[in-house]
A protein has these predicted regions:
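N-terminal small/polar loop signature for handling phosphorylated ligands or for N-terminal nucleophile
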Residues: 43-110, 196-262
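Proline/glycine-rich low-complexity loops and linkers
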Residues: 78, 129-165, 264-342, 346-347
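Gly/Ser/Thr-enriched, mixed-charge loops and adjacent short helices
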Residues: 110-242
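Phosphate-binding and adjacent anionic-ligand microenvironments
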Residues: 248, 288-474
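Glycine-rich phosphate-binding loop
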Residues: 95-109, 114, 240-263, 267-268, ...
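Short glycine-rich phosphate-binding loop at a beta-alpha junction
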Residues: 44-52, 180-183, 294-300, 337
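Gly/Ser/Thr-rich active-site loops/lids in small-molecule metabolic enzymes
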Residues: 202-207, 212-214, 267-286, 357-366
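An N-terminal, well-structured beta->alpha segment
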Residues: 1-66, 70-71, 153-179
Length: 474
């Protein structure tokens, strides 16, 4: 029995994440495996278990399997997988599952992303904290002495070929013009999935010449952190795109569920532009099959170009709060064909409403390879506005800072709404800003967008000065 691990430190709102040996160890993971089965009622059912390339993922996978089989589940070990491979397997096999990963966090971290059968997300609102509480009890008091059901079995299965074939069935790249692409896997799971899906590792080759960067699976991340959201981590990819004269670059995060795109000039294409591009393609595809006004989900931080493109294409845009669980819930409720976030998470109805960066990347490749323009010109069409990006301010009184900003715009021709934080938008549509408090850190997050840089930049500077209680410099 252990009293050293406090699971409240590692169980977050949407997943589990902590430092190995401090807030997660094999004993704790075994207890989590047992609690996962008990809380979700999975005795006698199949549970899928996989992990990324982190040093502790294999050990944790085995520990989770011990706990799950002890409580009567039949475990299928998937080995090393990306997060979207788990979602695929959970949807395809209609089985609950987990993947051990800490995504883009540093090497000393690991964590767990969990799904119910059908790739349905598990969050604090749908059982994650119940699993935590029972696992803590098992950790403190020991697992029940005698299981009330026969122990389950353990088998092994590789889903990489099935996953690759399924993605290729959704986007046909066989007839595109030849493209040279640089892919930075960041020593993460993209080093396994890219050769399988886009290369010829398990299926016939495509008209793609792949220049690999950091495909070796290494959970110590020897080259750079596997977090493409940070511009510093894109520098090697940008340099390689220019060096090799590539048509585009792709950067995956550690568990390969997010993908960032670089054009032939070495410049990033925003996730909002990707969302708009993919949305237009998905709307056209399902309209051709007879679906009227297909729904596309986007969070309120994506560019206002997204709902404009969706509407123009004959779709119905639906805005939601920021966050994995909100998008997935809205995808299911609305029967949406596609959803996108500013953080480069892309959700597809045909992928069990789950997110997959690889499928989004395939849409970009299909769009680029289906015409002759370079990506910079193709992408510019979907990026008509100027965005500030997300800017964090460390503020103790987040509500007070927000109130000061609202007061600043009082009497001006603006609209204010409070779906997720506070959004202030010009009545003439020329700019908008959003202030959103972090739930876990003392940060107030600022996002903004304008018709031009000349419009949005002074507003950005004034708002940040008010938030930080400074005076803007002339």
């Amino acid at each position: 029995m252990s009293e050293e691990i406090d699971l409240s430190q590692s169980f977050k709102a949407y997943d589990v994440r902590g430092i190995v040996g401090q807030s997660l160890n094999a004993e704790a993971v075994e207890a989590i495996g047992a609690a996962f089965v008990d809380i979700l009622g999975l005795t006698g059912d199949t549970v899928l278990v996989g992990g990324d390339m982190r040093p502790s993922s294999a050990e944790f996978s085995e520990a989770f399997a011990r706990g799950a089989t002890y409580r009567g589940a039949n475990v299928v070990m998937l080995g090393q997988i990306s997060t979207d491979e788990l979602y695929f397997a959970s949807g395809q096999l209609d089985a609950a599952g987990v993947v051990f990963t800490a995504s883009h966090n540093p090497a000393q971290y690991n964590g767990i992303k969990m799904s119910k059968a059908g790739a349905l997300p598990i969050s604090s609102a749908t059982g994650l904290y119940d699993i935590r509480d029972l696992a803590q009890q098992y950790l403190d008091e020991g697992l029940p002495v005698s299981s009330d059901a026969p122990q389950g079995s353990t088998t092994r299965r590789d889903v990489l070929a099935d996953y690759s074939g399924y993605l290729r069935s959704l986007v046909d790249l066989s007839a595109i013009r030849p493209l040279k692409i640089v892919v930075d896997a960041g020593n993460g799971m993209g080093g396994l999935t890219t050769p399988a899906v886009l290369g010829d590792a398990v299926l016939p080759g495509l008209p793609l010449q792949i220049v690999p960067l950091y495909f070796e699976l290494d959970g110590t991340f020897p080259n750079h952190p596997a977090n493409p959201l940070e511009p510093e981590n894109l520098k090697d990819l940008q340099a390689a795109v220019l060096k090799h004269g590539a048509d585009l670059g792709l950067a995956f995060d550690g568990d390969a569920d997010r993908c960032f795109v670089i054009d032939e000039r070495g410049l990033p294409l925003s996730p909002s532009a990707i969302t708009a591009l993919v949305a237009v393609r998905e709307i056209a595809r399902v309209q051709a099959a007879g679906e009227a006004s297909p729904v596309v989900i986007h969070n309120l931080i994506t560019s206002k170009a997204v709902p404009e493109f969706v509407t123009r294409a004959g779709g119905t845009p639906v805005m939601t709060r920021v966050g994995h669980s909100f998008i997935k819930a809205e995808m299911a409720e609305q029967g949406a064909v596609f959803g996108g976030e500013h953080s480069a998470h892309y959700y597809f109805r045909d992928f069990y409403n789950a997110d997959t960066g690889m499928l989004a990347a395939m849409h970009v490749l299909a769009a680029l390879g289906g015409q002759d323009l370079p990506l910079s010109q193709l992408g510019a069409e979907y990026e008509p506005y100027v965005a500030t990006g997300e800017i964090n301010s460390e503020v103790e009184d987040k509500a007070g800072a927000t109130a000061r900003v609202v007061a600043h715009f009082e009497g001006q021709p603006v609209e204010i709404f409070t779906m997720d934080g506070t959004t202030i938008a010009a009545a003439d549509g020329s700019w908008w800003i959003n202030l959103r408090p972090s739930n876990t850190e003392p940060y107030l997050r600022f996002n903004g967008e304008g018709a031009t840089a000349e419009i949005i930049e002074p507003i950005r500077d004034a708002v940040l000065a008010i938030v930080r209680q400074e005076q803007p410099t002339d």
